[in-house]
UniProtKB/Swiss-Prot annotation:
Listed SUPFAM superfamilies: Anticodon-binding domain of a subclass of class I aminoacyl-tRNA synthetases, Nucleotidylyl transferase
Taxonomic superkingdom: Bacteria
Alphabetical UniProt keywords: Aminoacyl-tRNA synthetase, ATP-binding, Cytoplasm, Ligase, Metal-binding, Nucleotide-binding, Protein biosynthesis, Zinc
EC number(s) recorded for this UniProt protein: 6.1.1.16
Full protein name: Cysteine--tRNA ligase
Source organism of this protein record: Persephonella marina (strain DSM 14350 / EX-H1)
GO CC field: cytosol
Catalytic activity: tRNA(Cys) + L-cysteine + ATP = L-cysteinyl-tRNA(Cys) + AMP + diphosphate
Gene that specifies this protein: cysS
Family statement drawn from the similarity comment of this UniProt entry: Belongs to the class-I aminoacyl-tRNA synthetase family.
Motif range ('KMSKS' region): 266-270
Pfam family, one: DALR_2
Length: 487
């Protein structure tokens, strides 16, 4: 099946066709490293991590670049407040970023460039825009002439007339037109600066990404990604500069993830309503946030709450539990008369999963297919326990279902990093083997009963207690767990 991708540029889903067959070049805007990362940053990281993983699953050779903005007004201001060099602030939060990314199992980008190591590339980029007549210098500042680029506004669907109504010139700016934006800013006392043909200064935010993309990926890339809030002005300004300079399409597909909100308001540091990623993984398995992010379509807003984290934690435990329970089921006695299997359900789940993912990376629908399989696995488990055994075919089908969940979850969704797929291990022969097997069976049934009680499946729990009693086993539920003994 072909992959469909929603393209912000065209406002519709399109068949994904890379520039070069078999290869995909992706750039996403990274963080400005002046503070800790919050759930909003985490969502964007997870979304594009999964997109990258799925493209790779489809057989593409993916080259992924994500930058660091390591010089910026916010970084400079923080450095002044802490009486530290701006580089110390940037290095501190780049280190924190890598810690967060590792904890949430975000795969490192192939290249993670910093602005400060690309100053010559940025200067060259700006000079070429000046040479083509799209930029001009005024007393050490360099601006992009928006009206010169006739297609300005095509990404965000805004007209120049609409934009001019709300535009204004900040005090001290010398630009010719309120719409024009800075490519290079003349230095101010006490701020970092680099030599340039226009005097000492530092680059403007919108230019940095363009220069780094041109250097590492070329003039046209397959996918440019980022948060929805970057569409305008940042990505609009990037597109204008890049296409003005190259006379080529800048990106074939623009993909934007929706924002994270809290009670309907955007999560942000300025509003003080943010939850740090460190707080998340100090309270939860990082997989829980990944699953929460994937439970909402990437283009939709995600309203964060601790209640939703708790709900997602339970869902994650069901998913993980279905994988783990193979180890319990294989300890049940063989029952050839147990005529059940999961092969049809596995095929439906895989088909549904890949159909959803190929429809604009629809992770909620993809997850629904996996949880339908989990439900069928639980049904088979309960029937096997009630029947007192399981057939070889049923057990093998459960193992395959477990492996499918593990493989998809790990390779595409980035889950289950600590779990291992089901591997058959030959039982070690010891003296009194029969007694050992009986003990394993009892403990396996008690574990199934405990799970049933936790899921409020009391009929199953009572049934297991009764069957164990018939086998001469007494179980006792205590505050520290379930104990058992022979009558």
């Amino acid at each position: 099946m072909s992959l469909k991708v929603y393209n912000t540029l065209t406002g519709k889903k399109e068949e994904f066709v890379p520039i070069k067959p078999g290869e995909v070049k992706i750039y996403t805007c990274g963080v400005t490293v002046y503070d800790v990362n919050h759930v909003g940053h985490g969502r964007s990281l997870i979304v594009f991590d999964v997109i990258r993983r799925y493209l790779r699953y489809l057989g593409y050779n993916v080259y992924f670049v994500r930058n660091f903005t390591d010089v910026d007004d916010k970084i400079i201001n923080r450095a002044k407040n802490e009486c530290l060099p701006f580089t110390v602030i940037a290095d501190r939060y780049i280190k924190e970023y890598f810690q967060d990314a590792e904890n949430f199992r975000i795969e490192p980008a192939d290249v993670e460039p910093r602005v400060t190591t690309h100053i010559p590339d940025i200067i060259d980029f700006i000079q070429r825009l000046i040479d083509k007549g799209y930029a001009y210098e005024v007393e050490g500042d360099v601006y992009f002439s928006v009206r010169k680029f006739k297609e300005y506004g095509k990404l965000s669907k805004r007209s120049v007339d609409e934009l001019i109504a709300g535009a204004r010139v900040e005090p001290g700016e010398k630009k010719r037109d309120p719409l024009d934006f800075a490519l290079w800013k003349a230095s101010k006392a006490g701020e970092p600066a680099w030599d340039s043909p226009w005097g000492k200064g530092r680059p403007g935010w919108h230019t940095e990404c363009c220069a780094m993309i041109f250097k590492h990926l070329g003039e046209t890339i397959d996918i440019h990604g980022g948060g929805l809030d970057l569409t305008f002005p940042h990505h609009e300004n990037e597109l204008a500069q890049a296409e003005a300079l190259s006379d080529k399409p800048f990106a074939r597909y623009w993909i934007h993830n929706g924002l994270v909100t809290v009670n309907g308001q955007k999560m942000s540091k300025s509003l003080g309503n943010y939850i740090t990623l460190k707080e998340i993984y100090s309270k939860y398995d990082p997989d829980v946030l990944r699953l929460l992010v994937l439970s909402v379509h990437y283009r939709s807003p995600l309203d964060f709450s601790w209640e939703k984290m708790e709900e997602t934690k339970k869902a994650y435990e069901r998913l993980k539990g279905a994988i783990d329970e193979y180890e319990i089921l294989k300890k049940l006695p063989e029952n050839p008369d147990f005529d059940e299997h999961l092969y049809d359900e596995i095929a439906k789940a895989e088909q549904g999963f890949y159909a959803a993912m190929s429809d604009d990376f629809n992770t909620p629908e993809a997850l629904a297919s996996l949880f339908t399989l989990v439900r069928e696995m639980n049904i088979l488990r309960d029937k096997a326990v009630k029947s007192g055994g399981i057939s070889k075919k049923a057990l093998e089908s459960y193992k395959e279902a477990s492996d499918v969940l593990h493989s998809i979850g790990k390779e595409i969704f980035g889950l289950f990093d600590s779990l291992q797929p089901c591997i058959e291990v030959e039982e070690i022969k010891v003296e009194k083997a029969e007694e050992k097997i009986d003990t394993q069976l009892v403990e396996a049934l008690i574990e199934v009963r405990n799970k049933a009680r936790k899921e409020k499946q009391f009929e199953i729990a009572d049934y297991i207690r009764e069957k164990l009693s018939q086998l001469g086993i007494v179980i006792e539920d205590t505050p520290v767990g379930t104990k058992w003994k022979k009558k």
